[in-house]
């Protein structure tokens, strides 16, 4: 979420978690192409093994993905979500949740028909902010996908199972309503749930309370880089032996008047009200800002040892990640891409992956004037040859889901690995000349993914990159 023209205030760099560098050698093996439409995948990198960096081999430190859950503008089912993406369908429409007629931007990736039935009881359904509802539903669906739904969760050591689901904005509806009650009716009319349901850590807390998970539990809030920060931190808890399993990702529900108005005030949003479905057009010369989205994307991450011991359905492997800061500007990215390129390089180092092994990038690609090209410049610094790499933009269809963006995009990345199909970047009408990658324009493409990276960047100059591949024993 970068690329505004604002004041020259400088952001301070974050203090990211650092992973211990206890690495062992790993011999890469090339396998056949995966079966299409299956959750399990056994692709591996096809690059030469002679000079490849060292990958983790210790099953206690290898981190695998065993479950995925989401709430999205395309519904709450992972397979249905990816089918919509593959078909190139736009989830963007005019906002009808409130009267947006006086806003210069009147559209977004608004979720409709959401139901938490079977996941949240009626009393909490009425009280909870949508941000919290999305977190709980996506988290429980991820556990079901990991074969840990219901009583099956009692088969693991809950003292070593944690939750790390972040959010950029927190319970914005609850916060907005609390302020309105204070102004209009006085402090006595503020709900006792105002503070608990507005703070950013409550999604992780409520999910853990509901499920009895006593492992590491907190949230990270780094704007639109939030989900990837959570994946990175969760994996490090596993690698350090502090957890066997982590539920990690992001959640967001900011399509309300104060959320829309705030981003309008930042001059961040597209104003293509006459044609909302073509408004999110990353890398297109006519792009005019990002489109707000909402939802949640959550992964179940486990040590390989723990997953194998319980016979878990392994859908991919988390190879590594990195986080850093541009230390440049509150909202604008560095034009030279140095922060992002450094983050990508550190991610590959952490993953034990050479640049030549990466052949798919799920880009941050928000459809902003400065941000899209800054990311491309950064990618070119790391990957000297662009011919073998395909890049796509999930946000072209679902909008920018802020703190949940990386979670929903990680799921799209894993599905690309599993299926051998990349979803298109839609609304590619007149691409920037500098974008000489294959952006999978307007139509899906079949592509065997060796190693994928997923980029997420946020206000404050927060950069995050995570790497995935098919799991291979």
Curated annotation (Swiss-Prot):
Region annotated Disordered, chain positions: 1-26
EC number of this enzyme: 2.3.1.41
Active-site residues annotated for this sequence: 224, 364, 400
Gene Ontology BP annotations: fatty acid biosynthetic process
Record GO terms (molecular function): 3-oxoacyl-[acyl-carrier-protein] synthase activity
UniProt domain Ketosynthase family 3 (KS3): residue ranges: 60-470
Biased composition (Polar residues): 1-10
Record-linked NCBIfam families: fabF (TIGR03150), PRK06333.1 (NF004970), PRK07314.1 (NF005589)
Role: Catalyzes the condensation reaction of fatty acid synthesis by the addition to an acyl acceptor of two carbons from malonyl-ACP.
SUBUNIT field: Homodimer.
Descriptive protein name: 3-oxoacyl-[acyl-carrier-protein] synthase I, chloroplastic
Species this chain originates from: Arabidopsis thaliana (Mouse-ear cress)
């Amino acid at each position: 979420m970068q690329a505004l023209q604002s004041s020259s205030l400088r952001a301070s760099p974050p203090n990211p978690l650092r992973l211990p560098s206890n690495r062992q050698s790993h011999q890469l093996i090339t396998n056949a192409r995966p079966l299409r439409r299956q959750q399990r995948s056994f692709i591996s990198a096809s690059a030469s093994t002679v000079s490849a960096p060292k990958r983790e081999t210790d099953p206690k430190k290898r981190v695998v993905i065993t479950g995925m859950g989401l709430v999205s503008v395309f519904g709450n089912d992972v397979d249905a979500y990816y089918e919509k993406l593959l078909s190139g369908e736009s989830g963007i429409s005019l906002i009808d949740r409130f009267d947006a007629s006086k806003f210069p931007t009147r559209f977004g990736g608004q979720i409709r028909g959401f139901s938490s039935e079977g996941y949240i009881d009626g009393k909490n359904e009425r009280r909870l902010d949508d941000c919290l509802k999305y977190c709980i539903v996506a988290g429980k669906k991820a556990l079901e996908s990991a074969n840990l739904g219901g009583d099956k969760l009692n088969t693991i050591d809950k003292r070593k199972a944690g939750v790390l689901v972040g959010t950029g904005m927190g319970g914005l509806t609850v916060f907005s309503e609390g302020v309105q009650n204070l102004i209009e009716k006085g402090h006595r009319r503020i709900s006792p749930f105002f503070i608990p349901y507005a703070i950013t850590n409550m999604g992780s807390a409520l999910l853990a309370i509901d499920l009895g998970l006593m492992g590491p539990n907190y949230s990270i809030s780094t704007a639109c880089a939030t989900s990837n920060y959570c994946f990175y931190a969760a994996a490090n808890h596993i690698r350090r032996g502090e957890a066997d399993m982590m539920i990690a990702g992001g959640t967001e529900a900011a399509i309300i008047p104060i959320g829309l108005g705030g981003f309008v005030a930042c001059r961040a949003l597209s104003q293509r009200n006459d044609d909302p479905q073509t408004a999110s057009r990353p890398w297109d010369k006519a792009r005019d800002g990002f489109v707000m989205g909402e939802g949640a994307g959550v992964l179940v991450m486990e040590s390989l040892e723990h997953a194998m011991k319980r016979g878990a359905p392994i859908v991919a492997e988390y190879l590594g990640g990195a986080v850093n800061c541009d230390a440049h500007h509150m909202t604008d990215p560095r034009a030279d891409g140095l922060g992002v390129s450094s983050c990508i390089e550190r991610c590959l180092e952490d993953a034990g992956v050479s640049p030549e092994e990466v052949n798919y990038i799920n880009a941050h690609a928000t459809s902003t004037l400065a941000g899209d090209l800054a990311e491309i410049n950064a990618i070119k610094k790391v990957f000297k040859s662009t011919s073998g790499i395909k890049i796509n933009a999930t946000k072209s269809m679902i909008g920018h889901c802020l703190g949940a963006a990386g979670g929903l995009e990680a799921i799209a990345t894993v599905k690309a690995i599993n299926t051998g199909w990349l979803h298109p970047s839609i609304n590619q009408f007149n691409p920037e000349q500098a974008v000489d990658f294959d952006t999978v324009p307007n139509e899906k493409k079949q592509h065997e993914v060796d190693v994928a990276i997923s980029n997420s960047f946020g206000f404050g100059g927060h950069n995050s990159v995570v790497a995935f591949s098919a799991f291979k024993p």
